[in-house]
Regions:
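Acidic, Mg2+-coordinating phosphoryl-transfer loop and its flanking beta/alpha structural elements
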Residues: 1-12
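Structural preference for solvent-exposed beta-strand-turn elements
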Residues: 18-21, 27-231
Length: 231
């Protein structure tokens, strides 16, 4: 298996001066070890392209533990909020081409995170499905999110104009993160945020979004909540 070969691969990679590849193998090995101990609605996903290497370990039924490293400090902070306020156990390691710009890293993390949730959720039976008007305030900012976990993909997002960057996070990627995540996982989401401070607007939106997602994914005793028989 992977763990049996990983040390050999790392040694060969370092010998050939492929430090990034050796690091990627180390990350994947640690994630594989961690995934063995998770038995709830969980998944381990990796995604590798010429632009990024993303590794995500997710436990939906967690307690909000996290280990996040994307190379973008503010993005890390938002993903930590995502894990904590959604009560998801979440490990993310991203190695991206940040020497070019931030776009590929943020987009690919969103896509891989959507894949991780999709794998962990499975057929979507026995979940609440809906979360309506999950509202959160942060000083002058208020954000409200509603979700339907039926597999009809749509995002309607209303948010004030932001300054170009919050920390090292380009705000043109703010909505794009949610688009990429929602398109990959497949559900309907309405986001409405009002405020003045760009930091507050982004953070309040991430928090209300993850709280809504957590409620929509909460387990119940019902079968699939649809007369169609599928979501």
């Amino acid at each position: 298996g992977f763990n049996n070969l990983s040390n050999t691969v790392k040694i060969l990679a370092m010998a050939e001066d492929l430090e990034a590849h050796a690091k990627a193998v180390s990350i994947r090995q640690s994630f594989a070890d961690e995934a063995i101990n998770i038995k709830q609605r969980s998944s381990f996903i990796s995604r590798s392209t010429n632009e990024t290497n993303i590794y995500i370990n997710l436990n939906i039924d967690g307690t909000g533990q996290y280990n996040i490293s994307t190379g973008l400090k503010f993005f890390d902070h938002m993903l930590e909020q995502f894990a904590k306020h959604g009560s998801f156990d979440l490990s993310i390691q991203a190695l991206g081409d940040l020497d070019i710009d931030e776009h590929h890293t943020i987009e690919d993390v969103a896509i891989t995170l959507g894949d991780a949730f999709s794998k962990a959720i499975g057929e979507r039976s026995g979940i609440e499905r809906y979360s309506s008007n999950e509202t959160l305030v942060m000083d002058e900012t208020i954000s409200s999110v509603s979700i339907d976990m039926a597999s009809r993909t749509m995002l309607k997002m209303d948010s004030p104009k932001l300054k170009d960057y919050v920390g090292d996070f380009p705000t043109e990627m703010f909505e794009h993160f949610f688009i990429s995540f929602i398109n990959t996982l497949g559900f309907t989401c309405h986001i409405s945020t009002e405020g003045k401070n760009s930091h507050h607007i982004v953070e309040a939106t991430f928090k209300s979004f993850t709280r809504a997602l957590s409620k929509a994914l909460k387990l119940n005793d019902s079968q699939i909540l649809s007369t169609k028989g599928i979501l």
